[in-house]
């Protein structure tokens, strides 16, 4: 059991005051290890809120550098960070918010050669990536490793998210394969309202904290979608498919696949 310092009691007092969280729940948060894949639009708010909450160890994977066009929605990066690796910029802000958080940075692409080795070090994975191939890679790696994860995607004025736990519906239960290259526009082609990234990212952060504290109902076997134009939120039931190629009773995928990177659903 963690012997809380006065500083920690004060820092996390609003969590500790919550009957459903308390000291025990905060201790679980502080012992948690979370991997955030992507330090862009979704990874930014996820990382900031998890750091503020006191997650003990946060890993960040991203091979990109900060671009001026990122600053409209990637709130973890500042103007001074343009040209800096996103993982370095994100680590600086996380440490500024909460110096007690251990940060692991992976300035590299997540692919079939490293995904399982990186993911195995963490208790929960957050998908904040910008393309379908990596989303499928994260899904498959997490299913193979038995790791829970939160999926997120944004485009224009819309967002979607769900949470996977072992035995529940996975990404392939909904979408069997990535769409053909060019079938779905990117945010650089179609645009995205900056605040949408914050809306969805904070939902993913909340799901992560709920997972570790055991509070409430997770978004398992259901896909949450929202349209910011109308502020309509919908929850669509999703079934675990016994015939799923990765999590079904007789899976046909036995290794990780690097799909063509041209098919994107969003840009960081």
Question: For each predicted feature, which ranges?
Answer:
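Adenine nucleotide-associated cytosolic modules
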Residues: 1-268
